[in-house]
Amino acid sequence: RNEKLQQLFEIEQYTEMALHYMRLGSETNDFVLRKVSLDDVIKEAVHKYARQFIRKKIALSYEAVETVVTTDEKWLEFVLEQLLSNALKYTPSGSIAICVEDGRLVITDTGIGIKQEDLPRVCEKGYTGYNGHADRRSTGIGLYLCSSILKKLGHTLSITSEEGQGTRVVIGFPQD
């Protein structure tokens, strides 16, 4: 039963990714920029992946934040879901931490990390790198979508990683 639920969840994720990919490519996108509680967006994304955290026994480190950012709530939530999905996929055991540092959202995992030669290309459309080749479920679309969406929202994306030690993803928001 749990395996079937997991497969259903993954199908839902791929469908959602395809829909966001198509919407992002259209001439008119449905961005609605407004002041949003970052805490609310984070909690929604984490809630969606709660089962995966429990199933994989991955510890989540997160404390509520008071940060308000100007963004599109729906699109930012999709980005966070993609980043959590990647962190969970490539963290066989250990933890994932979410925090805010100097107004930027930081997601850090203790996963397998990304090879240094792959790092500059991880946001290219279709690029899966070494880790993606090892995991046949990898599409090479997730980080491309994250990068493209954040760029359109006027946010920044920075990824650093040490192979075998984990990955750190930082989303920067323009200061109002």
Label each region the model flagged.
Residues 109:
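Acidic ATP/Mg2+-coordinating residue in the GHKL
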Residues 93-104:
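Short beta-strand/loop element within the Bergerat-fold HATPase_c
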Residues 87-88:
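Short helix-loop "hinge" at the ATP-lid/N-box region of the Bergerat-fold HATPase_c
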